[in-house]
Amino acid sequence: CRGAHEEVIALSEKLNAPVVYTFKGKMEVQYENPYEVGMTGLLGMPSGYYSMHEAEVLLMLGTDFPYSAFLPDDIKIAQIDIKPERLGRRAKVDIGLCGDVRMTIQALLRMLDPKTDDTFLLKQLKRYEGVKKDLAAYTENKGDINKIHPEYVMSEIDKLASDDAIFTVDTGMTCVWGARYLQATGKRHMLGSFNHGSMANALPQAIGAALAYPDRQVVALCGDGGLSMTLGDLETVVQYKLPIKIIVFNNRSLGMVKLEMEVDGLPDWQTNMLNPDFAQVAEAMGMTGFNVSNPEEVLTTLLNAFELDGPVLVNIMTDPNALAMPPKIELGQMVGFAQSMYKLLIN
């Protein structure tokens, strides 16, 4: 939906329809949108999930969202995409239109009659307000020593970053916090390994973004697992004098891998990490490095990092037990988690 923000709003207004977006489309759709009800997918929100599943018709705009389990299979689906091979690839489509999203919506707006009943829209907006309150509650508790709440950290980054910042997010738990707590402004951009889900993407993408857009703030949001795979890139950042702000969400584990294993009923195996002092590594490479283990020092350290010229790495000791709940919990997920805990106890 890039470049079609106004058209999406106009279509939603005419149909009194809620708008749901994917993680990849968040920065293009969320901002200044009175009809948005949150994100869908594993990192998404109940309001986004249920809006799609309680609707009678779903219109998919320029999306190749790969997680079919989150798409409804018992309602009518229409899809617009400029690439014909994407039509019907992820879900059974009743109507498929091949074309530019912006131009196609413009044509449709002239043919559609306004829908005056806003009952469904208001129901979903009310649910979304509750979801937002729940998400905000996680940021009110900063956490404890060496167990800083990542939700709080990401919410502070959102407040401090510039309106046109470029964020890069590592695959894993960092993606969850970025998806839920970084807000779109219409000028911000977010990069990640959204199609492939490969690890260790944040720092290389940040290097590319900083070289391509030297006048914009670039923030690399790294997991400790991802950063461990790309430590050599810190030298590249210094060599090219790139003023990237590198924030490490250091939960001393491969958090998302661990969670996926538990959901599948597997005992935790080789997901805990023995990390180096990332701040000292950064200093050895020639950039400024900070360690943060006290939640009361998060805000002042982030402020210092954003105000300093040149590259900075902030290594924040986050809570390894912070959970990312999916928008809808299935029975199989609960059974798998219980099996995982049982196997761990036996062993």
Task: Label each residue range with its predicted role.
Residues 25-126:
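Glycine-rich, acidic loop regions that bind phosphate or pyrophosphate groups
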Residues 10-16, 68-86, 187, 326-341:
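A short, gly/pro- and small-residue-rich
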Residues 8-12, 129-204, 209:
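Active-site diphosphate/adenylate-binding microenvironment
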Residues 4-11, 67, 73, 156, ...:
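A short acidic, amphipathic alpha-helical/loop segment
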Residues 1-4, 146-150, 226-229:
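Active-site glycine- and acidic-residue-rich loops that bind
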Residues 5, 42, 49, 88-98, ...:
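Thiamine diphosphate
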Residues 17-23, 78-81, 246-249:
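Short internal beta-strands
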Residues 3-24, 165:
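Redox- and metal-dependent alpha/beta enzyme cores, enriched for Fe-S-associated oxidoreductases
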